[in-house]
């Protein structure tokens, strides 16, 4: 199997509840390595740019407002089938529909404040990683 990289955000709701460590533990327990990570407070411009594909959707304004409401953790995860594995760890977008044991089922309160974001494909992962990290901020995990 090929080693992939994917992008993840621990959203403001999960950061505010001190769930960063629990979420990182789930990544690592599933065999994903964290190869880049930083805490940032998204500006409106940065959030609007990241979610630009949703700009015409009715929830766009509320999404940007939520994502700028507090700090987030952005990270690059690496491992076999990283994109799919991370999406399985996160669970369904709506926590009410997420399987027990997933981040969203266990740690999220609503579809609007659902604790985590994860890339949905290799192409979006590459774009999202480049949006937040330069190549020299990503560290190879050779040990």
Swiss-Prot record:
The keyword Amino-acid biosynthesis does not apply. Pfam families: NDK. It catalyses: a 2'-deoxyribonucleoside 5'-diphosphate + ATP = a 2'-deoxyribonucleoside 5'-triphosphate + ADP; a ribonucleoside 5'-diphosphate + ATP = a ribonucleoside 5'-triphosphate + ADP. SUPFAM superfamilies: Nucleoside diphosphate kinase, NDK. Disulfide bonds: none annotated. Its main location: cytoplasm. GO terms for biological process: CTP biosynthetic process; GTP biosynthetic process; UTP biosynthetic process. The active site is at residue 117. Gene3D superfamilies: Nucleoside diphosphate kinase-like domain. It is found in: Cytoplasm. Its EC number is 2.7.4.6. Keywords: ATP-binding, Cytoplasm, Kinase, Magnesium, Metal-binding, Nucleotide metabolism, Nucleotide-binding, Phosphoprotein, Transferase. ATP binds at residues 11, 59, 87, 93, 104, 114. InterPro entries: NDK-like_dom (IPR034907), NDK-like_dom_sf (IPR036850), Nucleoside_diP_kinase (IPR001564), Nucleoside_diP_kinase_AS (IPR023005). GO terms for cellular component: cytoplasm. Homotetramer. Major role in the synthesis of nucleoside triphosphates other than ATP. The ATP gamma phosphate is transferred to the NDP beta phosphate via a ping-pong mechanism, using a phosphorylated active-site intermediate. PANTHER family: NUCLEOSIDE DIPHOSPHATE KINASE. Belongs to the NDK family. This is Nucleoside diphosphate kinase. It comes from Colwellia psychrerythraea (strain 34H / ATCC BAA-681). The lineage of its organism: Bacteria, Pseudomonadati, Pseudomonadota, Gammaproteobacteria, Alteromonadales. The gene is ndk.
